[in-house]
Amino acid sequence: MQYYVGLDVSVKETSVCIIDKAGKVIREVKVATTPVAILAVLTEEALAIERIGLEAGPLSQWLYSALAEAGLPVILLRPGI
């Protein structure tokens, strides 16, 4: 099954929401805004993650780079869409 991840990034915490192809919420959790903490959530189960989206902004560039370097299918989304 395919899974999709949304990240709502703030200075101290990031909300992580994982849904399946049907849109059913599989997991919601808040973690520290660090690549290590976010990667831990995304890799603790062997999920076939199709896409990870986070809003483009001042807090997203370094996080996007870290997730992409880890081989995850991450994209930046334009604010307001």
Locations of the language-model features?
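Phosphate- and other anionic-substrate recognition elements at nucleic-acid/protein interfaces
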Residues: 1-81
